[in-house]
């Protein structure tokens, strides 16, 4: 029976939380999209990855309720709405509406908001989200092309886009342990607080949350909360090693595809270009006629194939600085340019798969999503972590291994380390 069912709002976020579940003792399978009603899976945790982070609230709600219905059919005991640790959601965002819809469908009146991931520098203090030593609103996320985060107060952000009031469990209460947190949640529930932000400064706070929230029907947050919940649900750690083993990367030709324009991905691309062959994507050529786009995709695939025997996999990147990105969006439009680049990456990936490439390292949630769909991968095993929240994964049905990285995750040497430390 599935103990924990996770509804993740993007592909890289799904692999992020799946890796934390596996590494903390809970065997996990990730599903790419909602499977048919008769699809069965034998595991203790399931992560359903959607592509709802940047879409309209209406579409995100519909997709999330569809995922919830499948998990309910499987007899799932606890539900987890997973979003980014930087709470990617503006005043018109969909985290609030999705949370409201899930609460209503489950007949619940309260849930928690816990995006923190201290190991990656995401902490919550007095209800405000920090990235390292900066308020979220003063970090690189304020320049995000789709969800610019200009307010660090999670209670205020939540109330702007959701239907209820939002309270807080401050760090002083969190320090007192699970019983104190439960008591505070009960008090806030009596006061009509539909959502409760949880201060989180360290991993012990995540463990406390896991213990306190074991019986809450719906929880919401980033991947950090999974650390505590997995340890509450896990029977033992014996199954963890076998689950990780199933996801280890296999040998074969590889490629790095980078569609993210985050601060860290810019650093990673610049660092990798000093070690490996790289080629920048020409956005203008992505927006030409269909025949021209096909020709460009073939040209790029041929370039990658020419480097298939290199010591490090070749890199194709659309990664650009905030200034360059602003110019691109001003000239061609944010949505049009983003869609065109994703379509190109998908076409290149398809050609490389047909030519026997079996290892794909991908930076960016949207890029990861469309490439995984194009490669025909519906489910995969979670393998060893390259960086916190970024594991290697292996298709359950195809000879394909992938590393799907959220924009700001990983260190500067991520692309090379993913290959060197996990050589098959």
Swiss-Prot record:
It is an enzyme of class 2 (transferase). The keyword Kinase applies. Its EC number is 2.7.1.217. The keyword Nucleotide-binding applies. Disulfide bonds: none annotated. It catalyses: 3-dehydro-L-erythronate + ATP = 3-dehydro-4-O-phospho-L-erythronate + ADP + H(+); 3-dehydro-D-erythronate + ATP = 3-dehydro-4-O-phospho-D-erythronate + ADP + H(+). GO terms for molecular function: ATP binding; kinase activity. Keywords: ATP-binding, Carbohydrate metabolism, Kinase, Nucleotide-binding, Transferase. It holds the Pfam family NBD_C. InterPro entries: 4-carb_acid_sugar_kinase_N, 4-carb_acid_sugar_kinase_N_sf, NBD_C, NBD_C_sf, OtnK. ATP binds at residues 260, 364-367, 407. Belongs to the four-carbon acid sugar kinase family. Catalyzes the ATP-dependent phosphorylation of 3-oxo-tetronate to 3-oxo-tetronate 4-phosphate. This is 3-oxo-tetronate kinase. It comes from Pectobacterium atrosepticum (strain SCRI 1043 / ATCC BAA-672) (Erwinia carotovora subsp. atroseptica).
